[in-house]
Amino acid sequence: MDIARDPLGGRNYEMYGEDPELVAQTAAAFVRGMQSAGIAACAKHFLANNQETNRNTTSSNLSKRVMMELYARGFEAAIEDGHVLCIMSAYNAVNGEFTSYSKKLLTDLLRGELHFDGAIVSDWGAAGQNKEGTLAAGMDLIQPGPNDMTACKQAVQEGRLSEEVLNDRVTHILQLIVEIMKS
């Protein structure tokens, strides 16, 4: 769902173009088609991930209007019209806060304003060392895999992560599995 903003972008071939409405229409159709074949689509990279150079350290500084009209539009369509089952966060920061750690983006915007009820997954390694902070922000699945189980359990035991939050994250993953198995 990324918007092609730089003609020299090395991954522009993965994007649907620079027009937010074209991206939105294409995203919704692609998600519907993929999911009609029993495959869970994963819309990525939420949000404003539009360059490869320094993408792990850069911040996309946006007004709320620009965020919603340009960068969130494709995700909105994938959610409303495509009923996408999974969304991947981006490496970059938005307005100084990394997306994988941002409650404003993952919980308030994505789940609250855009009404996404599927699974939110991190890009590979984007969660860094603060796994409980990522989960508390709204991330359901941290990639790469299962070597973080001990850290999550310890965070719950020490009160750094509530059991309620962890249960909510697991619920989203189980719901994703159930949806896939229905197909």
Residue ranges, per PLM feature:
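Glycoside hydrolase catalytic-domain context in secreted enzymes
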Residues: 1-183
